[in-house]
Structures are given as structure tokens and as C-alpha cells.
């Protein structure tokens, strides 16, 4: 694997400029993530400690934990969930729901592969190979599903906490997690956007030929 480049937080150009305090927080967060990915690349996930991450990022260990409650969160946390939900809410009201979802997912994947391709692959590989990372991802799925469910509720007029919406969103999030692991286990040979499209087609049509 080539040396990791610095992790960048995607920021739409139409958003107002952040204040100095917020920019410093983002810079610290990115420094911690970049340090983590670099250390994992060099010595592996299990050998990488929070103390080493803090030292390389030039912050204290307590600062690392203030931004990320656990080491697994450093690997898993990104800004694409929020962008995905934002995209879903901005799609035309008369557009079929799955088409809106397909569009938003393509954009999220495109941003991840365009700006953080190495990081995206490493994250997926760790989810497939490291039980602690995979377990933490499962814990985080409910929060992601709830955010998507709220967007679905706005579009459909359904209660986001209804059984039907929860089943749909958690099935979707679980399916996308499986896409990530499948991609890693097959050596990243397929285009990730194509795999996401295939998964969404299963949601639309079921296991039909």
C-alpha cells in the first residue's frame, strides 16, 4: 500500500466559512485520523495504540478520546453519512425513493473514492478483518439508520420510528456494510459504485434473475 495522504473533511463550497474555533477542531480531528491511518499502515491495527496516535498527531491522549471515544471510532468515523442524508433531503420530491437513494449513494461513494480512496479501502479491510472494528460498526449502525429514517419519514410522511421504516433503513444499512466487507474480501477487484448499485437493485427487485 502506498503511503497514506492526509485525510480531508469534505465541505460543500456553498456552505458559509467556519469560525476559527471550528476550523481548529476539524484540523485536530483530521490530524488524529491521518496519524491513525499512517500507523496502521506501518504496523497494523492491533499494534497501534492511542498513545502512539496522540504522539504522532501532536496532541494528548485525552484529546484523542475527546474527539473519538474509542480507537475503532477513529477508523470508522467520517462525514459521509451526513452528506448522504443531506443529499437525500435535496432530491426532487417526485423522484422515486430508491432512485434518490441511488443518486445520494453514488455521490457519497464518489467523494470517498475521489478524496480518500486509500482510507476507504483500509476502513473496509479493517471491518472485514478486525472483529473489534466490525463490532463497533454494528453498534454505530443504529445511529446511521435513524438519520436515514428521518429523511425517509420527511419524504414519505411516515413515522421514522415506525416498524416499517426501521426495518427498511436497518436492512439498507446492513446491506451497505456487507457491500463494504464483500469489496474487501474480494480484493477490491470491483468498482465500489457498481457494488452499491447491485445492492440497491436487490432492495428494489429482490433475488430475481
Language-model features and meaning:
Residues 1-12, 188-209:
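C-terminal peripheral helix-coil segments that are non-catalytic and often amphipathic
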Residues 2-43, 47-62, 83:
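Basic, helix-initiating cap at the start of DNA-binding domains
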Residues 55, 69-70:
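Residue-level detection of the helix-turn-helix DNA-binding "recognition helix"
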Residues 62-69:
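Base-recognition residues in the alpha-helical recognition helix of bacterial helix-turn-helix
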Residues 86-123:
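Hydrophobic alpha-helical connector segments
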Residues 138, 154-200:
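Hydrophobic/aromatic-rich alpha-helical bundle segments in the mid-to-C-terminal region
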Amino acid at each position: 500500500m502506498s503511503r497514506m495522504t492526509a485525510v480531508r473533511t469534505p465541505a460543500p463550497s456553498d456552505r458559509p466559512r467556519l469560525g476559527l474555533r471550528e476550523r481548529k477542531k476539524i484540523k485536530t480531528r483530521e490530524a488524529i485520523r491521518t496519524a491513525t491511518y499512517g500507523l496502521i499502515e506501518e504496523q497494523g491495527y492491533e499494534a497501534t495504540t492511542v498513545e502512539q496516535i496522540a504522539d504522532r498527531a501532536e496532541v494528548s491522549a485525552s484529546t484523542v478520546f475527546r474527539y473519538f471515544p474509542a480507537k475503532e471510532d477513529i477508523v470508522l468515523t467520517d462525514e459521509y453519512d451526513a452528506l448522504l442524508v443531506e443529499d437525500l433531503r435535496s432530491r426532487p420530491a417526485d423522484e422515486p425513493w430508491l432512485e434518490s437513494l441511488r443518486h445520494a449513494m453514488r455521490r457519497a461513494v464518489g467523494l470517498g473514492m475521489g478524496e480518500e480512496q486509500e482510507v476507504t479501502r483500509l476502513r473496509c479491510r479493517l471491518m472485514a478483518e478486525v472483529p473489534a472494528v466490525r463490532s463497533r460498526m454494528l453498534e454505530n449502525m443504529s445511529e446511521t439508520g435513524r438519520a436515514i429514517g428521518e429523511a425517509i419519514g420527511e419524504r414519505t410522511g411516515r413515522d421514522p420510528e415506525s416498524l416499517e421504516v426501521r426495518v427498511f433503513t436497518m436492512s439498507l444499512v446492513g446491506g451497505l456494510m456487507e457491500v463494504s466487507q464483500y469489496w474487501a474480501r474480494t480484493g477490491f477487484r470491483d468498482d465500489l459504485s457498481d457494488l452499491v448499485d447491485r445492492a440497491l437493485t436487490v432492495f428494489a427487485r429482490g433475488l430475481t434473475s
